[in-house]
């Protein structure tokens, strides 16, 4: 029952984000983004239905028991949160540099708990004004950590899942403590070209490191994010942030996305959703991963749907020839 509840919570969170994007696009009269988001929402539902068979098997399986390793996982995630928050705000590294550095350290020194630490690092990217109380970060970490443990067998192999859980934790914590997330101005259209360029480069590079060089997903994402942040003149620039978002899409398993063409499509979709969500949920941790998660899940649904349409067209063509 708890596993089912966590699944429903994740789905409702995803739909809430897409609904917020739709409302923002309507207010800004952006018809193109409105159509893309609507299609993404439909594809998300399609993909969820496809995942339901695996999820039912998880729900019917043995319930998760409180083991020492789970306590270590929650501790690792919380540690990643506070370390990144410290590097981000007290040292002044900025969110991308801090998170990617923590991710690399985790992948190399604490491989077993690298995913949990990296998930926590996204919470640590949250705004210090909204999460000024250390206990609010702890609350966000506990919520995200619980979701991390309960959803370990859900949506396996999709990019952005870690950030999506971090977003669910920070958004829930901000609502509980009464410090709502902010809404800012939409992304300037003058930045569209650079944003999409770096999104494609970062997404494809991360996927390449996984597929061609057999590097684990956390290392691939953190390494690409760190390199771009160090090479760009301003490590906190929106272009760097967008590129970091794309690295999470690039964390998608090569078993899920089998070709570079499919990854290119997911990278472009990530860029579109990044633009659509830019003004929303400012100050939250995990927002970038949530965008990537929606892009990879809904994008996979689009790819699967297109394959089904092609199969049906081929069958109808074969039947017409046989007649």
Where are these regions (language model features)?
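Interfaces that engage single-stranded nucleic acids at replication/repair/recombination sites
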Residues: 202
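Flexible interhelical linker loops that connect adjacent transmembrane helices
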Residues: 55-64, 181-189
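Membrane-water interface of transmembrane alpha-helices
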Residues: 43-55
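C-terminal transmembrane helix-loop-helix hairpin of multi-pass membrane proteins
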Residues: 1-45, 65-100, 104-178, 187-199, ...
């Amino acid at each position: 029952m708890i596993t089912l509840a966590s699944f429903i919570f994740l789905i409702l969170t995803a739909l809430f984000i897409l609904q917020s994007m739709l409302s923002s696009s309507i207010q800004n009269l952006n018809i193109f983004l409105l159509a893309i988001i609507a299609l993404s929402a439909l594809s998300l539902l399609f993909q969820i239905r496809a995942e339901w068979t695996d999820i039912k098997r998880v729900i019917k399986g043995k319930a998760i028991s409180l083991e020492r390793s789970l306590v270590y996982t929650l501790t690792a995630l919380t540690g990643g949160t506070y370390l990144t928050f410290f590097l981000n705000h007290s040292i002044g590294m900025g969110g991308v540099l801090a998170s990617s550095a923590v991710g690399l350290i985790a992948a190399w020194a604490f491989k077993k708990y690298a995913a949990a630490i990296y998930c926590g690092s996204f919470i640590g990217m949250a705004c210090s004004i909204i999460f000024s109380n250390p206990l609010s970060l702890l609350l966000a970490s506990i919520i995200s950590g619980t979701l991390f443990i309960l959803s370990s067998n859900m949506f396996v192999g999709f990019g952005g899942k870690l950030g999506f859980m971090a977003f669910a934790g920070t958004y829930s914590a901000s609502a509980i403590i009464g410090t709502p997330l902010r809404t800012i101005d939409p992304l300037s259209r003058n930045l569209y070209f650079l944003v999409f360029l770096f999104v494609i480069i970062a997404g494809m590079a991360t996927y390449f490191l996984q597929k061609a060089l057999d590097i684990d997903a956390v290392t691939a994402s953190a390494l690409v994010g760190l390199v771009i942040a160090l090479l760009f003149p301003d490590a906190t620039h929106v272009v760097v942030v967008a590129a970091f978002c794309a690295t999470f899409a690039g964390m998608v398993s090569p078993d899920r996305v089998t070709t570079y063409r499919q990854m290119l499509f997911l990278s472009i979709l990530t860029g579109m959703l990044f633009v659509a969500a830019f003004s929303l949920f400012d100050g939250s941790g995990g927002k970038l991963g949530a965008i990537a998660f929606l892009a990879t899940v809904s994008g996979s649904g689009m790819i699967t749907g297109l394959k089904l349409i092609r199969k049906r067209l081929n069958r109808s063509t074969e039947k017409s020839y046989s007649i």
